[in-house]
Design a protein with these regions (language model features):
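Acidic-enriched, low-complexity/disordered segments with a strong bias for Aspartate over Glutamate
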Residues: 13, 19, 29, 68, ...
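Short amphipathic alpha-helical segments
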Residues: 18-46, 80-88
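Short, well-ordered beta-strand segments in beta-rich or mixed alpha/beta enzyme
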Residues: 5-14, 45-80
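Glycine-rich beta-strand-turn "strand-cap" elements at beta-sheet edges
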Residues: 1-4, 39-61, 84-108
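Generic low-polarity alpha-helical segments
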Residues: 10, 27, 34-38, 64, ...
């Protein structure tokens, strides 16, 4: 089983492909500044992905894995600040889904 006990999967919908690609470029420039903070707070993994199975939708998915609820809570202030900055730069709709890991099978 994974070390992660709590997972958050968020999606961000952008108005255009250009806005989405610009966000990805900006994240590449910003992530070295931001990622050490949640890592120190107990975040185990952060993954960015392009959702490809929704035609006409410009959506990114973000997977956050935390070692426990305390780590998740510590990191929320950090991610809220990042999200606030992202929304100030361009319009985006963010939807979050949180879950507790019940079963985790690895095949690698």
């Amino acid at each position: 089983m994974s070390e992660a006990k709590l997972i958050n999967y968020s999606t961000a919908d952008f108005g255009s492909k250009g806005d989405m690609e610009l966000r990805l470029l900006k994240w590449q420039d910003q992530k070295e500044e931001y990622l050490p903070m949640p890592e120190a707070g107990g975040m185990l993994r952060f993954t960015t992905m392009r959702v490809w199975n929704k035609e006409g939708v410009f959506r990114l998915g973000y997977l956050f894995e935390y070692k426990d609820e305390e780590s998740y809570k510590k990191c929320q202030l950090i991610w809220q600040e990042i999200e606030k900055n992202m929304k100030a730069e361009m319009p985006v709709k963010v939807f979050a889904n949180r879950g507790i890991v019940l079963d985790d099978s690895k095949f690698y």
